[in-house]
């Protein structure tokens, strides 16, 4: 009888321990707020900015998971575009995407010019092949427009001049989460005194004095994933006019 009583006491004690551990461990699982977790996830790449010499990426390794084959050093993809609506039914979008293969230490991509229409009309898109050597963009396709040719050859990615060393100082953002994807978003009001905003205004024709919004979007695991992606947008849009810069830097398997 005493033996059974001791067993009962042990079981009761075990239940109490499990309950306390579960309740106490809840905060550990939750940890930082989702806003802080999103910023920390972005900081893994934004801390690398500014990447003045893109060839430095050949010697940097990103987050690796089971999608990488053995021996694959991976590939960095950097992207920047500037979109602006010129009419109520048109949106012009120009930018560049560059893939830097760490296995071959080569960088290839393209500059794109797109025009979107709201009405029943297909969008126009033209890609111009480029490569990078000695941190210089080399245009591979023939371009007759001298202004476009100059824009391509002198193009700089946002990540080459952006600086987010003070990212932790951004607080009280508007957070939204889609658990089905999952995806995470946070938005911050920026100041026109922000150096990143000043840089963009000096490089692009932004016809508004409105201070922009910084929008950070993550698809996939906050801890990191080669399947998901992170996108940063600085949105100057006002009323019915869309004006924004989109940037991302991702690390994925080079061998598929």
UniProtKB/Swiss-Prot annotation:
Keywords: Cell membrane, Lipoprotein, Membrane, Palmitate, Signal. It is found in: Cell membrane. Its main location: membrane. GO terms for cellular component: plasma membrane. A lipid is attached at residue 23 (N-palmitoyl cysteine). A lipid is attached at residue 23 (S-diacylglycerol cysteine). The keyword Lipoprotein applies. It is a lipid-anchor. InterPro entries: Csa (IPR007595), Csa_sf (IPR038641). Residues 1-22 form the signal peptide. Pfam families: DUF576. Belongs to the staphylococcal tandem lipoprotein family. NCBIfam families: SA_tandem_lipo. This is Uncharacterized lipoprotein SAR0442. The lineage of its organism: Bacteria, Bacillati, Bacillota, Bacilli, Bacillales.
């Amino acid at each position: 009888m005493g033996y059974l009583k001791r067993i009962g006491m042990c079981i009761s004690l075990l239940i109490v321990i499990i309950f306390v551990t579960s309740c106490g461990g809840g905060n550990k699982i939750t940890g930082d707020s989702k806003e802080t977790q999103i910023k920390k996830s972005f900081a893994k790449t934004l801390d690398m900015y500014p990447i003045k010499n893109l060839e430095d990426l050949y010697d940097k390794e990103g987050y690796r998971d089971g999608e990488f084959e053995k021996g694959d050093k991976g590939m960095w993809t950097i992207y920047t575009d500037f979109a602006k609506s010129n009419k109520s039914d048109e949106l012009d979008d120009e930018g560049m995407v560059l893939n830097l293969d760490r296995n071959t230490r080569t960088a290839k991509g393209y500059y794109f010019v797109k025009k979107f229409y709201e009405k029943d009309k297909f969008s126009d898109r033209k890609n111009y092949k480029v490569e990078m050597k000695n941190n210089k963009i080399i245009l591979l396709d023939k371009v007759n427009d001298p202004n476009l040719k100059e824009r391509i050859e002198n193009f700089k990615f946002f990540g080459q001049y952006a600086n987010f060393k003070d990212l932790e100082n951004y607080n009280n953002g508007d957070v939204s989460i889609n658990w089905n994807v999952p995806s995470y978003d946070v938005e911050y009001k920026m100041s026109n005194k922000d150096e990143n905003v000043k840089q963009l205004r000096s490089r692009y024709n932004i016809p508004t004095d409105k201070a922009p919004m910084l929008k950070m979007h993550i698809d996939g695991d906050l801890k990191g994933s080669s399947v998901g992606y992170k996108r940063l947008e600085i949105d100057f849009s006002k009323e019915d006019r869309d004006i924004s810069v989109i940037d991302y830097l991702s690390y994925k398997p080079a061998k598929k």
